[in-house]
Amino acid sequence: MIVGKIISIFDISVEVILDSSDVRIGDILQVKDHPEFRFEVVEISNTSATCISLETTRGLKKGAVVE
């Protein structure tokens, strides 16, 4: 299920604009077709989620689809 897209990356913090409201704090998200990029949701606002990367963010790009 597609959750949204990455809108910013700062060190290990990743901001995701949400397409779905089914996301909860503590959920683990990953980049579609790249399971090595996984994040834990730590904060949710009306339209976005702030996540902390569980691995390196090297090679991660803005606009990547998150599921």
List the model feature ranges, each with a label.
Residues 1-10, 15-67:
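Acidic-enriched and Gly/Ser
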